[in-house]
Swiss-Prot record:
Protein name: Orotidine 5'-phosphate decarboxylase
Active site location: 56
Protein role: Catalyzes the decarboxylation of orotidine 5'-monophosphate (OMP) to uridine 5'-monophosphate (UMP).
Entry annotated with the keyword Translocase: no
This enzyme's EC code(s): 4.1.1.23
Recorded GO CC terms: cytosol
One Pfam family from the record: OMPdecase
Keywords from the named record: Decarboxylase, Lyase, Pyrimidine biosynthesis
Subunit structure: Homodimer.
Residue positions binding substrate: 6, 28, 54-63, 111, 164-174, 187-188
Signal peptide: none
Amino acid sequence: MILALDVTDRDEALKIAEDVWEFVDAIKVGYPLILTTGLGIIRELAEFAPVIADFKVADIPNTNRLICDQVFEAGADAVIVQGFTGRDSLDACIEIASEYRKDVFVVSEMSHPGGAEFLQPAAESIAKMALEAGAFGLVAPATRPERVRKIRRIIGDKLTIISPGVGAQGGKASDVIAAGTDWVIVGRSIYKAESPKEAAREIAEEIQAELRGEY
């Protein structure tokens, strides 16, 4: 399970990470936290789990190189980038990641309703491009397990799929795992819970039950 830590307070972020680290495989940070705390929070959170920088990098190749260099220099283990900018922009991100021996996840389709408007028609082409380019993985929506299943058929077992949208957006961990995702991404259902630790524990138990075939 990946924790989407979309809070805007450094102390809160570190407290939640400390509370839930035993139940998560990675922590995903994005603009809400980075813009208020700076890139330095990445190394602090890395004390608890590997950090994925969710910047959805989407620019020309040179700018992508500059962004990814800063992300990995700050201590991130992976970066999330957009695929719709094309192969040369993606190659630039993978080039920098390889220099740091880090990973790139490519967004194939986002989890909100609008993700089906423009990204969904291109998602399968993006998945094929990510595979050919040598990306580490793809982002596919937990809110639409059938789409995860479709993407998995395209890439086989060659790429890792991570799926946002579990919990507050309506996705169910067991459903999307059954569809072929490797890691679910959970945010508000954990960090807005009265007890983030207990919320993380419950979701982790649901995931383990699905993996054992109990659902």
